[in-house]
Amino acid sequence: MPIVRDLIQIVVIGTTPGHRPARLQLESFAGELLDLLRTVRRDAWTWFEPVLAYDNARLPEALLLASTVLGRTDMRQDALEALDWLRRQQTAPEGHFRPVGTQSFGAAFQPPRAFDQQPLEAWATIDACTLAFAQDGDRQWRDHAEAAFAWYLGANDLGVRIASPDGGCYDGLQVDRVNLNQGAESILAYQFAALAIARLRNKAAALDTNEQRPVAASGGKACR
């Protein structure tokens, strides 16, 4: 998939910034993604495709990563707008996280349906919001990432835990129950989500500490 190749090229450029072939491929793939967004978007639909599908937040995350490497502020703005639109689609009226349900797949330009909800969506959302928070420091990204992680712990439509007591993760949330299977994808999604939210919390705590640190009147340096 181009989305995977985008991320690979970003890694290559991050280690060898002068790698011209990698940069050219990144420009091409990211440009295609941006063109899709600008072609498909319409009133009340700020997305790359006519449908919401699987692992949705990876699309704006990839575009946001590419914008950082390429120094494209226009690309960055479009990526943040798409992620913000997805954030609103994934927020229930009661305020908790509600990932795009699998019943939504194939429904063009329609609001997402609530079920079935899958662990992969919460992980992808946390990763994308963590990157967005690093980009602009907007508290909404931090809050939405926390809401997505809380989904695993019971802050969801049924009020039940998706994460199992032994550190595993069930396969999803159906309209009337939890799918008690524990596939590798679901377990890994929860484990990676836990790592991602820990990193986000550490970064946010460091920023909060810096903001609260008093500044000396002379010289403008932080007091110690």
Model-derived regions, located:
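Glycan-recognition and catalytic cores of secretory/periplasmic carbohydrate-active enzymes
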Residues: 1-224
